[in-house]
Amino acid sequence: MWDKLEKGPIIMIGLADGRSHSEPLTAQLDRDQVDTIWFFIGKDNRLAKGGAAMAQFVSKGQDFFACLSGRVAVDNNPAMIDKLWSKPVEAWFPGGKTDPNLALLRFSIDEAELWEADMSLTGKLKLLFGGKIRADEEGSHAVVSDTLV
């Protein structure tokens, strides 16, 4: 999943409170933390209040899909801000790493449901021209609820 996120890092994420809509944010990845995705947001962003959250991701090639659940919280760890900081992030925060509106949001993933459309050639032809796709011609699916390594 991390390779797919690096190629197209936009994730739809929102609070799982039944009142908020998801919004597109750019994922900041730290491969040392396989159960965490980071986002730079404004302190005035609705996600800054934290809580249970859901995120959805579709890869750039539209062959990989993920639905993630967990919790979001602001975590303005200066070392992590330094590690994840980039020119594209700086474009959103003119005050740099000390911008008064800057917040680093941690999304701690509790569970992930993943689908990969690694369909066989025969399955792709059936999609194109019609026909029933058998189980061995479908992609793969997994539910991951323990991300500890």
Report the location of each language-model feature.
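C-terminal edge-of-domain segments
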Residues: T98-V149
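A positional/architectural concept
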Residues: S20-T26, W38
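Short, surface-exposed beta-strand-loop junctions and turns on beta-sheet-rich folds
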Residues: N45-L47, L121-T122
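Short His-Asn-centered micro-motif
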Residues: F40-G42
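Short active-site oxyanion
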Residues: Q33-I37
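N-terminal leader/targeting segments and the immediate start of mature chains
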Residues: M1-I10, V143-V149
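Short, structured beta-strand-loop surface elements
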Residues: L47-E111
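A short, Trp-centered hydrophobic/proline-enriched beta-strand micro-motif
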Residues: D3-S20, A53-F57
